[in-house]
C-alpha cells in the first residue's frame, strides 16, 4: 500500500495534477442541497414526512399515502428545518435553525398543515449568550409514544442547566409539572413508559458526577454510581423492555468502551452485551415492536450493527442481500413494524430511501437523496491501517480518483477536527469526492487523540500538539 510508510509522499506531492478519467463535475454536484433528507413514516403508515429544499432552505413536505397527495407544510425563507419526528399518527414535531448562528426552536403541526403549535420559541445564541432572553431553557426528554397528546420536556427556570420535568400538550402548548429536579440533574433517562428513572447529576465545575436512580414514581432517588468527570466513562443508555434492566456504556477496566447490562437495584453489572478491543461501542438499538433492545451500533472500519436479536439479524441480512455493498439503516418504522423505511448509502452514494413491506418482503424505491450524484463517477473510500514510527497502529481512509491508475497522484492529507474526540468515518463526503474528482488522492488519518478507538488511543495524543 502506497501509504504504508509514506515513502512516496514527496513524489506524490511534487507530481502535477493530471486530467481526471471522469469529467470535472460542477460544484453543485458536491455541495448543492440534497433533494431530500430525514424521510419518516407515521406510526400508522399513512404519511411520509421529509425535508426538501424550497427557497434555498430546508422545508417540510408530507405525502398522504392513502389519498395519494403531497403537501408542503412550511415555507421558511430565513430559517432551516433541521429535524422532524412524528409525535403521533398525524402530528409532526420539527426543529428550526437560523443560518449563521446557533439557534433552536421546537414546533408541532398537523399532517395537513393545520394547528401549528410553538412548543419552544426560536432562541438565538451568540456564543454562550442568549440574544432574546427566553423565558425558559427547554429540552425534549421523551416523545411519549404511548401518549399521543403529550411530550416530556425539561424546563429550566432560573437555574442554569438544571431543569424540572413537565408534560407538555403538543396542541395547546400547555405545561403540567411532573417532577422537581431532585438535585443537580442535567440529563435524564426514561424507562419505556416515559417515566424518568435515571438522572446524571453534576454541580457547576464539580470534579465528580453522580448517576441517580429510582425504582418507581414514588420511590426515593439513590446514587448508583459516582465517578470523576474526566475519568472512566459510565453512561446509562436506556432500559430494556422489562423496565428493570439498564444498559450502560463504560470503559472501566479496559481501554475501549463496551456495553453492559446492569441491575440498578443490586447495583452490579449482570452481563456484557458488546465489547471490541479496537473500537468503542456506540449506542443501543431498541425495538418498540419487539419491546426489547435488539442491537448495538459501533464505528469499525465501516459503520456497523451488532445484532443480539435473531429476528432483526435475519431481517438485516435479507436487506443487505437485496442492497449489497451499501450501509443499510432502518431509519423509520410503523408501530407494528409492517412497513419500514431504509436509507441505503455508501462512500460513493449519498443515499436512496426504500420502503420495505416486512410482511410480503417487498422492497420499493422511494427517493434518492441527491439526483445530481452519479455513484459511478464517484471515488471509493478505502479503509487503511499502518503503524507510526513508534509502533502505534493508526487507521484511516484513502480515496483515489475514479478511473485513474494509482501512480504519480498528488496527495492531500485531510485531517479531521478536534483534535480529541472526533474521527473520520466511511461515508459519502462531498469535500473528499470533490478533491478526488479534481485528480487528487486524499488520505484521512484517525491520528492519535481521535475518538472511537478507546481511552488509551485518545490519551496517546495528549501533550503532542503545538
Which residues fall in each region the model found?
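Beta-propeller folds
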Residues: 8, 12-15, 20-340, 345-349, ...
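An N-terminal hydrophobic leader/cap segment in hydrolases
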Residues: 349-384
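A short acidic/small-residue loop/turn micro-motif
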Residues: 183, 277, 370-372, 401-402
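Internal amphipathic alpha-helical segments of the cytochrome P450 catalytic fold
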Residues: 57, 256, 350, 363, ...
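Cap/lid segment of the alpha/beta-hydrolase catalytic domain
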Residues: 372-466
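N-terminal secretory signal peptides that target proteins for export/translocation
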Residues: 1-4
